[in-house]
């Protein structure tokens, strides 16, 4: 049973911890948002030199190809790419992760679980940069020469998000009482029907949580994407890196603006997923 914090010391401690966590979470986000509408000294090559005034010039500059670069990509294209990749990652991660989590939940005390589960968790212990470099080295010859293909990005994102999907689904699948499956089988349901009519409805919340994890991880993934992405198919994090790696106050302001856009897109995506969920299923 959970104990309520009745003493003023415990309440004060909890309040301080919450305040610190809230500050550490909100302060960086507010800093990005405020700097995205701040004016910078464009005559200075130093990044982040603030001047007085509020402006949306940084957002307007995102649509202007100031250097007439052939690799210029408007932010709408980067946002579209990121959302498309994230949608594909959600589908791939759930299609692969659901059977894997189901197998792990049905062999929780076996040698299969003991050795296969750590293998499936390898992306958590491996840097995304290492994963991207491995793709470049391994997939460099026909018929698996995918280095120039945009499909490589959602594949990499799926591998990064895969462990989170399994960890979200496996506990829910393990919590399903065996007698429910047995009752469905006695009534004549096939193994597929048992999975469809018993398992899936009971893990609806976990499925939505897993989908949200996969979606947001894909939106913000940078390490592997930086190595395998093509210049004409950038994501929002890559565009932010392009701006922040170039000197000048204008590029710095554009990086702040695009970072704010990424923050808003991720927040809107999570809210939409929460809004379209079935009532009482998938509640966070």
Regions found by a protein language model. Name each.
Residues 79, 103-104, 122, 179-187, ...:
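Short hydrophobic faces within alpha-helices
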Residues 3-31, 114-116:
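N-terminal signal-anchor/first transmembrane alpha helix
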Residues 88-120, 137, 141, 178-180, ...:
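Transmembrane-helix boundary motif in ABC transporter permease subunits
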Residues 27-30, 34-37, 95-100, 133, ...:
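Membrane-embedded alpha-helices of multi-pass transport/permease systems
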Residues 16-30, 122, 126, 159, ...:
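Transmembrane alpha-helices
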Residues 1, 6-10, 36-46, 53-70, ...:
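Interhelical loop and adjacent transmembrane-helix boundary motif
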Residues 1-5, 42-53, 64, 72-76, ...:
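Membrane-interfacial helix termini and adjacent extracytoplasmic/periplasmic loops
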Residues 86, 90-98, 102, 106, ...:
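Hydrophobic positions within alpha-helical transmembrane segments of bacterial inner-membrane proteins
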